Amino acid sequence: MDDPDCDSTWEEDEEDAEDAEDEDCEDGEAAGARDADAGDEDEESEEPRAARPSSFQSRMTGSRNWRATRDMCRYRHNYPDLVERDCNGDTPNLSFYRNEIRFLPNGCFIEDILQNWTDNYDLLEDNHSYIQWLFPLREPGVNWHAKPLTLREVEVFKSSQEIQERLVRAYELMLGFYGIRLEDRGTGTVGRAQNYQKRFQNLNWRSHNNLRITRILKSLGELGLEHFQAPLVRFFLEETLVRRELPGVRQSALDYFMFAVRCRHQRRQLVHFAWEHFRPRCKFVWGPQDKLRRFKPSSLPHPLEGSRKVEEEGSPGDPDHEASTQGRTCGPEHSKGGGRVDEGPQPRSVEPQDAGPLERSQGDEAGGHGEDRPEPLSPKESKKRKLELSRREQPPTEPGPQSASEVEKIALNLEGCALSQGSLRTGTQEVGGQDPGEAVQPCRQPLGARVADKVRKRRKVDEGAGDSAAVASGGAQTLALAGSPAPSGHPKAGHSENGVEEDTEGRTGPKEGTPGSPSETPGPSPAGPAGDEPAESPSETPGPRPAGPAGDEPAESPSETPGPRPAGPAGDEPAESPSETPGPSPAGPTRDEPAESPSETPGPRPAGPAGDEPAESPSETPGPRPAGPAGDEPAESPSETPGPSPAGPTRDEPAKAGEAAELQDAEVESSAKSGKP
């Protein structure tokens, strides 16, 4: 600012400012009065007059328009040099607002204007005689029919409720013409109207409307509506400096509109707001830079506060309505605490790359509790989702856990099985305590250990049976039957009822220290029930043959059983399919895999009850043999059992008695001597 004394905005005392203004502006006082009068001339000469301030301002780049400064300072100080005319008791402005006379020249009553000119924008734009009557001033204008406002009329304007109501309606009429709407009469809050775009365009093209807005602001301050001034000025500062929607109004808003506010505190707030949003700030000439930097406004008005209210109230489907209310501003009372923290872009949630399916599923469930998310899944559905995700990411060669549907099928198959109390109790506890979708992964036995075990068992059988063809054929049949569910060298591992891994492949020989299975015994051969594992199966036993109690390993399955044989319920692994069975062969319910079928069973044969693993069936037993209920694994099908085979007692450990050893030696010798096929 070149001359801060001509503006009392930042002065401590108004009287000192007036003295300084008289001292520094003594030479230009008359010219300032003439410019003030010329600023409110008749509208017929408004357009040429509006071009002169802009050309004058362009020649004063980097400095302030002092003519506007003096004009507004004179208005704020109530025209100290103005000599009021003798009106002889005439009050034309009061008569017009009382709807007693028409405005001149060629005018109409005020009620006609307020009621019929609301949407007639062409008439409001082209008629240049009504504005001096709607918003009278104490300054004379070019329309000599419109008389200046007197102090007596000012007092009546302020005291008459009827006149105040019409004055507010006239203010709303002109706001609508400019694309603005009055939102609150009490505070003076204004905002964009629905048709603001077209009206703003007209406001940019027709610069004489800037003079009309200056007159409106001055008249509001004169006639007791000062609280309407600051919100309207704030609106234009936002539109010109922040949104840059009204470039044709920008200079007038800085030179005239801001300094039409008579309240010094509000005026300082507006100047500081303009300084904050003016670019470049170093060229701001409407206030002292040092005082603007030190100034701390009591309320921090935010230029986009009106837009936030529009977003809250406006309908989302109406772009005109959204745009019309985007520039809403607040009055002095509403500007306190109006600051708003802009919401930046929200960062996207980053999921760790090494997160497994369980962590990702938990993240999905945690994110599902938001407002726009579906309801959280039940525990059962959550576990199913986890199981499906783990199955998708599991390699195809790796066996996956049992699903809930598979466990349910197993439970249904077990309903008809006659299990022992110990196995039923153990299986029920372990199945009930295990989650359906979280079965224990099976651990396969090393291939080398399994091959060594099979070779050792085979050697035991070969030593007992010699080089007889019967033993060789029986071993071949046993290997063929055992290899059908799982190929040799790739044994199939399964799960028992209580989740313990068990071998489904048939064992070819007993462990060391356990009695081997006799073969080729002419007498009846009772088969003992299986212990932890089934005993090996005898082959070609024409007569009854007592068998010792089984040890930890299962007995191999016999073949060619002429008599019928009811099969007990299967364990976790299936029995082989029956073939060449002339007699009836009832099959027990299947557990995890189908039970093996007996082959060539012409006569009935009861089987003994199984232990933890099923006893393999003896071969070539001509007599009937009762079948007992299966344990954890199914009993393999017997074959060629001509005589009855009563079942002996079951033991988990091999028999150590001397009788069993002697009986075994006798059987081995008899089988070696007899060369029966």
From Swiss-Prot:
Residue numbers bearing the Phosphoserine modification: S299, S315, S349, S361, S378, S382, S403, S420, S484, S537, S557, S617, S637
Residues recorded as bearing N-acetylmethionine in the entry: M1
Organism superkingdom: Eukaryota
InterPro entries on file: OGF_rcpt, OGF_rcpt_rpt, OGFr
Tissue specificity remark: Highly expressed in the heart and liver, moderately in skeletal muscle and kidney and to a lesser extent in brain and pancreas. Expressed in fetal tissues including liver and kidney.
Xref: Pfam families: OGFr_III, OGFr_N
Similarity annotation: Belongs to the opioid growth factor receptor family.
Name this polypeptide is given: Opioid growth factor receptor
Organism: Homo sapiens
Gene (name only): OGFR
